[in-house]
């Protein structure tokens, strides 16, 4: 089961045991299994992709999986510089390494219109661990396929193949320069002031975040300004929501803190999604994990209201609106957190939030800040 779970690109393993394992004598412990290694990409495949890139037509290299870490992004950035191609990250990725000194990468947007605009004019799409881009849902009068009709799609590496190795060989074939053209530069913003908004929460984090932090991002609609503020901060790991289910933000932050006890972890959590797995706070308290949970308290399932508009609903009636409201009654995140043993604060101004965030970074966690945002 361990070997299956560790197999690239990461799997889910279910272990079924007979009941008598609980009381019968067992044999000696099983030896630690060897982790499966990614299979190599055929040389011919890499040469074909190199040939495509040498043509100089508008090309996009779409990345996902292990190539979203520092080495893979660096290699992709070198290839982009040599070929003129753009590098874009798949919309959802389990882990991305970003920040100062790392290669700049765009991310495919969730809404269809901006995604279509990003890929407009693309003649060749090269997949490295990624899947062909399609819309997340079916929406009226919107295409499901996000690439232009005449775009040719090429697969350099599947998810279970050695994408890093393939990029290294491709960079050599293209005589790529030693470093990417675009690297994230250090841009530390001033602390925000006044009324607290989701964007200002991210601005405050960008001003104060320590190097090598880990961000578990399930801010949903409140994370729209995240990249604008965070990309120029010191190096950090970004753990994205990986699909359509909600509730992964705090459990992922908990796991990251267990795995990396020497790094500060930030759980950027939408309030509606957080209600699914708030028991993570108890685990954080029990294990004394260094996690700062920041709750975007807009008191609504804002993403679902957006989906209503996308399917053509122009006016939301009182009954439907009440289904998406989190204000009847209002959820008291401070009391919820303290009931689970986590030190908690509520902020509704930037000045309060800045103060609480700075204190939470200085002091080992866990901590929770409920950011009551106005938007």
Located regions from the model:
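A general structural motif
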Residues: 35-50, 108-109, 196-197, 218-222, ...
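Glycine-rich, anion-gripping cofactor-binding loops and their flanking helix/strand elements
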Residues: 65-156, 233-263, 275-279, 310, ...
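Active-site diphosphate/adenylate-binding microenvironment
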Residues: 182-262
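Structural signature of the thiamine diphosphate
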Residues: 1-30, 48-59, 115-138, 172-180, ...
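Short beta-strand segments
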Residues: 14-18, 62-64, 90, 127-129, ...
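Short, solvent-exposed amphipathic alpha-helical segments in soluble enzyme
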Residues: 1-4, 30-32, 73-84, 140-145, ...
